[in-house]
């Protein structure tokens, strides 16, 4: 039920309401789960997938049946790994062997873990991990090899950061990108190998690891920018000291509401946004190499959400006060764009890149570099689709005109009735 406040919001922001209605009414599923024929373990896997990420499960469940369970299991395995790494109640002595051996643990169909902290978001996944392991055992050997290899890479990478104490503060930019590689870049590698193995993506994608890496880096870096306040409150700092030390003596100054500190904090966030934004054209290049529609949706939606989130965070002091997220209307518009074709995905990227440019502050030390990164996105799109126009802007204008005419019509009718 929409509140009165919500109704007023959408009436004053009609560009938010239209995509929500379109998504609800017109969106069709590329594929659909056959829940009637699923075993209890399969249903349990989807249940825990939904607990870990509602947005991801919605996209995952529409995948081609060939990839549906392998990717579901892949995600749950890595989520289990991530849950161990994230748990601040576990000592390094407990974490390290769990992380390094997780690629063999997934073959134990009776393994469960009950020692996660009581407030750990995904502890139930580990408590009932045996159902994931049993379904993993049924996955094709070709997919099993890929999942095992990526789990080993990620587990060892996470363990290295835990042992070195990096999770309480990343020092250098190269450390930051290495961390993002282990928690997201290798995920992109695994997904690409699964896509190519299933013959739903161009094999040439595997020949360009830079594109694969950028897909993971773009998502993870955007999440780290958005979550800066939440991580600070948990005494975890992923923004590299090499960056933030240019703007503050300690990290507390960045999240301080004092005006002179806030200006420096925004300049720091601009540098963080710039690092992520420079990956955007690689992401578009990767997406264009995906053939099958459900897989296209699967890779395009998160990237479109990321560029929108990056735009929301850019020059936004609220990121230092609370966790922020894009609106439902924006999310629905992005999902509409990302489940059609490459041209619509490009329109979404162009739309948000232009908004970033519009928000760009000439007094910011990264002003010119931010503009250059946005122009790089424009050049990629113009190179692929030289005649592509931002039809969304035209559609929004037309919708506003129709709405205004409707309001004027109602007002005129009311006035006539009073005569």
Curated annotation (Swiss-Prot):
Any GO BP annotation: farnesyl diphosphate metabolic process
Key words, A-Z: Isoprene biosynthesis, Lipid biosynthesis, Lipid metabolism, Magnesium, Membrane, Multifunctional enzyme, NADP, Steroid biosynthesis, Steroid metabolism, Sterol biosynthesis, Sterol metabolism, Transferase, Transmembrane, Transmembrane helix
An MF annotation (GO) of this entry: squalene synthase [NAD(P)H] activity
Assigned GO CC terms: endoplasmic reticulum membrane
Induction: Expression is induced on squalestatin S1-producing YMG medium.
Membrane-crossing segments per the record: 397-417
Swiss-Prot/TrEMBL cofactor(s): Mg(2+)
Membrane topology classification: Single-pass membrane protein
Record Gene3D superfamilies: Farnesyl Diphosphate Synthase
Enzymatic reactions: 2 (2E,6E)-farnesyl diphosphate + NADPH + H(+) = squalene + 2 diphosphate + NADP(+); 2 (2E,6E)-farnesyl diphosphate + NADH + H(+) = squalene + 2 diphosphate + NAD(+)
One Pfam family matching this protein: SQS_PSY
Location(s) in or outside the cell: Membrane
Enzyme Commission number(s) of this protein: 2.5.1.21
NCBIfam families, sorted: squal_synth
Name listed for the protein in its UniProt record: Squalene synthase R6
Organism for this UniProt entry: Phoma sp. (strain ATCC 20986 / MF5453)
Gene (name only): R6
